[in-house]
From Swiss-Prot:
Catalytic activity: S-ubiquitinyl-[E2 ubiquitin-conjugating enzyme]-L-cysteine + [acceptor protein]-L-lysine = [E2 ubiquitin-conjugating enzyme]-L-cysteine + N(6)-ubiquitinyl-[acceptor protein]-L-lysine
Subunit annotation: Homodimer. Interacts with SOCS1 (via) SH2 domain and SOCS box. Interacts with HSP90AB1; prevents nucleus translocation of phosphorylated STAT3 and HSP90AB1. Interacts with MAP3K7/TAK1. Interacts with PIAS3. Interacts with TICAM1. Interacts with TRIM15; this interaction prevents TRIM8 cytoplasmic translocation.
Native source species: Homo sapiens (Human)
Name by which UniProt lists this protein: E3 ubiquitin-protein ligase TRIM8
Domain of life: Eukaryota
Principal place of residence: cytoplasm
Length: 551
């Protein structure tokens, strides 16, 4: 009731501008109150007409801001009610020697404060409730119910808040709601958050893988497109070569025609030159004979005149052969070239007939794998060397892939049967159905391995077993022998069963490594290469609270 009264009273003391309790309240002529700083800033932002922010009444000039003394006194008294008293200092109840030290932790169930040095002492004390629940001493006030002055040890599922027992069961605000112990609910929330975290990490990894695939595919397509561009350029260079060859042949036709014409022209010139030499020779003889006619003695013998006249008559009576001149019909020749140009232009001017989409995005359907992404990431954490988990195309896969087909302990002469994934082969006797979905090989294939080091687990009936190269677990070479169920996969290793679930007594910690069935594949390799004693309880390089069976 008092809390409701305070809330109602506080609503009347809130500034309409800053929505906080008044600070130096002033009153306008319209009787509305504001903080002096708030109304000053509001009027400073609006350089135009001055108005009241609440009733919107306009003023011709800025009115005087009078301090509301009555409201100021009420605000001061209200603020005095909300001044929290400093909490009393808590001291450790376990300190017996000297003055008690200030408490660092407070157990909400036992209501016992303790210092840092006595935290373990308090945890060892018997608790009648569900166990001790320690919080920081500074957070005790936050864990206290302001209405009932009791610690909030329950969690209301409806309101999603921590409540005390009086709020839940004794006519409280949360009566009838589903409640749970706050520690139990905290563990449930932690498990739920861890599960969601694993899912989100798996989704993040999947998205990262998709992005990597997209980036890789982008680079691959860019390389292919660049290669295609080069091939297209070579094709067009061939087209240019064809055009150059056609141009060469066309020019060669012109050159041949010109050479033929020049040959005919030279023959005509040679023939006319011979006729000219003959005419010049006769003309010279005729001129010489004409000079002799000046003397009358010439007439003594005129036979030479008759002979010369006959020759001259023969030379002048024969007609000259008609001269052949060149006639170049360039239009006819250019028409033939224009026909080729038109055909080529018609072929090239048309739109490029792109074939059926030669580059498109197609969905990538992931192939089914035998283990989930979380299991593979868990395995990759144990084995950070990515090359060790490569398939048969990798260095290790090639080394042990061949060993899987050779005759060895537990798989000699056995046919290979396909597993659930198309990437693995498992050795099976007599073509039986596969009991494991990954490649397997005997531990003797490891460095410094021998037949004496073949692992023998009691729950497998003393049978020789193989080691899975992907899941890092044991599997038998016999399919469902003796009615046994398929052997556990990673995450359910038979040699990592907690002590409360394993019925057999745990053996003492060995001082030296003997047969190493309790170690992971990577530790087998390390055990053969590193001197000294192997730490059986640090399988993956980190401390572990689980029990490991080594027999």
């Amino acid at each position: 009731m008092a809390e409701n009264w305070k809330n109602c009273f506080e609503e009347e003391l809130i500034c309409p501008i800053c929505l906080h309790v008044f600070v130096e309240p002033v009153q306008l002529p319209c009787k509305h109150n504001f903080c002096r700083g708030c109304i000053g800033e509001a009027w400073a932002k609006d350089s135009g007409l001055v108005r009241c922010p609440e009733c919107n009444q306009a003023y011709n000039q800025k009115p005087g801001l009078e301090k509301n003394l009555k409201l100021t006194n009420i605000v001061e008294k209200f603020n005095a009610l909300h001044v929290e008293k400093p909490p009393a200092a808590l001291h450790c109840v376990f300190c017996r020697r000297g003055p008690p030290l200030p408490a660092q932790k407070v157990c909400l169930r036992c209501e016992a404060p303790c210092c840092q040095s006595h935290v373990q002492t308090h945890l060892q004390q018997p608790s009648t409730a569900r166990g001790h629940l320690l919080v920081e001493a500074d957070d005790v006030r936050a864990w206290s119910c302001p209405q009932h002055n009791a610690y909030r040890l329950y969690h209301c599922e409806a309101e999603q808040v921590a409540v005390c027992q009086y709020c839940c069961y004794y006519s409280g605000a949360h009566q009838g709601h589903s409640v749970c112990d706050v520690e139990i609910r905290r563990n449930e929330i932690r498990k739920m958050l861890m599960k969601q975290q694993d899912r989100l990490e798996e989704r993040e990894q999947d998205i990262e893988d998709q992005l990597y695939k997209l980036e890789s595919d982008k680079r691959l397509v860019e390389e292919k497109v660049n290669q295609l561009k080069e091939e297209v350029r070579l094709q067009y260079e061939k087209l240019h070569q064809l055009l150059d060859e056609d141009l060469r042949q066309t020019v060669e036709v012109l050159d041949k025609a010109q050479a033929k014409f020049c040959s005919e022209n030279a023959a005509q010139a040679l023939h006319l030159g011979e006729r000219m030499q003959e005419a010049k020779k006769l003309l010279g003889s005729l001129q010489l004979l004409f000079d002799k006619t000046e003397d009358v003695s010439f007439m003594k013998n005129t036979k030479s005149v008759k002979i010369l006249m006959d020759r001259t008559q023969t030379c002048t009576s024969s007609s000259l052969s008609p001269t052949k001149i060149g006639h170049l019909n360039s239009k006819l020749f250019l028409n033939e070239v224009a026909k080729k140009e038109k055909q080529l232009r018609k072929m090239l001017e048309g739109p490029f007939s792109t074939p059926v989409p030669f580059l498109q995005s197609v969905p990538l359907y992931p192939c089914g794998v035998s283990s989930s992404g979380a299991e593979k990431r868990k395995h990759s954490t144990a084995f950070p060397e990515a090359s060790f988990l490569e398939t048969s195309s990798g260095p290790v896969g090639g080394q042990y892939g061949a060993a899987g087909t050779a005759s060895g302990e537990g798989q000699s002469g056995q046919p290979l049967g396909p597993c659930s994934s198309t990437q693995h082969l498992v050795a099976l006797p007599g073509g039986a159905q596969p009991v494991h979905s990954s490649p397997v090989f005997p531990p003797s294939q490891y460095p410094n391995g021998s037949a004496a080091q073949q692992p023998m687990l009691p729950q497998y009936g003393g049978r020789k077993i193989l080691v899975c190269s992907v899941d890092n677990c044991y599997c038998s070479s016999v399919a469902n022998h003796g009615g046994h169920q398929p052997y556990p996969r990673s995450g359910h290793f038979p040699w990592t069963v907690p002590s409360q679930e394993y019925s057999h007594p745990l053996p003492p910690t060995p001082s030296v490594p003997q047969s190493l069935p309790s170690l992971a594949v990577r530790d087998w390799l390390d055990a053969s290469q590193q001197p000294g004693h192997q730490d059986f309880y640090r399988v993956y390089g980190q401390p572990s609270t689980k029990h490991y069976v080594t027999s």
